Amino acid sequence: MSFHDLHHQGVPFVLPNAWDVPSALAYLADGFVAVGTTSFGVSSSGGHPDGARATRDANIALAAALAPLQCYVSIDVEDGYSDDPDAVADYVAQLPVAGINIEDSTHERLVDPALAAAKVAAIKQRNPELFINARVDTYWLHQEANTATTIERALRYVDAGADGIFVPLANDRGELAEITRNIPRPVNTLPVRGLTLTELGELGVARVSTGSVAYGAGLYAAAQAARAVRDGQPLPRATPYADLQSRLVEYEKRTRTT
């Protein structure tokens, strides 16, 4: 089954988002067949806030590090790190991945949809087989957060060659149903509180990305473990050291043969 096929299974395809090799290995150990990345997790790990084009070089390194894994990889490239569509296409061409996620905002402001569409078109022309997931940030940024604008922007990206549309924080049942009904491509959301995976599928959602949820949960768990030691409480459950080490040993062997 191809990465494209995973978006057409009748039930939403769950894409967990990693920020480094160990997090990706953890997902594979749990049976996932594809891994995305979280730009927030990558930028935060380097001490940078999200959305500031700070992950450009880190993503090149991460894509190369994840390439030996026996799974599909999709990289979150923020806005492509440039306002020049050809420069964005040049950047994406360096990534040995099955898909990318590219957003239509820069520095927390929506950009002209014509520019975002031009980026999608340039990428698709350079790499026709790449799965381009175009993110519409209307709801995420609370800017023109309505179905009409969201659908209008999404259709421009579809016409430019987008294979999927990501609408994070579109959480209302009725709005989600309207969005998926009017976009002729797989629609991607973040987890929606109060809606199960099955219910999201019934609303027409094809893919659910974990986003930064797992990264945030990991930071919370780290602080919780430290508090437990400090306060004399039972330690929380954790993946055993031996399992983590074993995964990395196997990963290192694989990198030597690829």
Question: At which residue positions do the language-model features occur?
Answer:
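Catalytic beta/alpha-barrel core
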Residues: 15, 19, 100-103, 147, ...
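Active-site mouth loops of central-metabolism enzymes
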Residues: 6-23, 48-56, 73-87, 133-149, ...
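Glycine-rich, proline-tolerant flexible connector loops at the mouths of alpha/beta enzymes
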Residues: 34-60, 79-84, 98-115, 123, ...
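Extended, intrinsically disordered, low-complexity segments
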Residues: 212-258
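N-terminal amphipathic alpha-helix/helix-capping segment at the start of soluble metabolic enzymes
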Residues: 1-17, 21-29, 120-125, 130, ...
